[in-house]
Amino acid sequence: MNSKLSLSTKLSQSGKTQLAEYFATPPFKVITLPSYDDAWVNGLNAMQMSSSPGVLAGDVLEIDISLAKLTALSLNTQAFTRVQAMNEGESAMQTTHISRAENSRLFYLPHPLVLHKDSIFKQQTQIEMREQSELIYGEIVAIGRVLNDERFAFRQFSSHLKIYALQNDGKKRPLVSDCIQWLPSKMNLTALSQMENYSHQGSLTYLNLAKSNAEIKQQVQALQQQFTDEKALLIGISLLNECGLMVRVLGHRAETIQQLFEKIGKQLKVL
């Protein structure tokens, strides 16, 4: 099935973020939620939903999100995305494109992906940011239905994340390029520096084009100190080359990583 979700934001006369345009084909749907206590006081809180039991063979999913100047969007999803079993030669893919105007802010944390036996899933995410914009973006993936004894039983998983700063001359300046490529039949994914004995991996990327590298470095040091004694998760926090940081996590439960990213995201919103 070919499915598309497209949404954009606008600023109301009272300075609140609203949906400007919204289009979705099954199984996608988005609902806006009541305002809540958040550092982005004029932001919009929304939930991305799906009526499908998961990602099926042959699915081509397209997500397009555009934020207008001075708007802020916090977008979560309803539930885990399960990539269902597929026959040999079948696959599914998702492309996500996010464009950000000046002084816009986005928090986007989809629920974890669960890779079922024999599945192949490929996703590509491209994000474009303009001056003074802010991004908190997370991805979490499970290596299979671990409680069913499925560990690395999928055929392939790839995830490519590219983030650019759009300059006034129209050129793109690369900020982040991150790639995950898992082929269990050809790779020892339990080796040292790979997944080892962990079953879930998460990455959280934070970029703020209004902050200096010195300010971001202080945030990195504060987060590193905060999670020094964490036992349930293996956490690495790194300073990006420009205007941002990345948190990489290995764990045994998706909910633990999800809650960690929500906690960090809430902190980053107020810094």
Where are these regions (language model features)?
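Short, structured patches in soluble enzyme cores that scaffold and shape functional sites
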Residues: 67-69, 77-79, 100-102, 110-112, ...
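N-terminal, charged/glycine-rich beta-strand/loop interface patches
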Residues: 1-102, 106-112, 117
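Solvent-exposed loop and beta-edge segments used for protein-protein assembly and interaction
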Residues: 1, 57, 90, 117-119, ...
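Structural motif
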Residues: 72-74, 105-106, 134-135, 202-203, ...
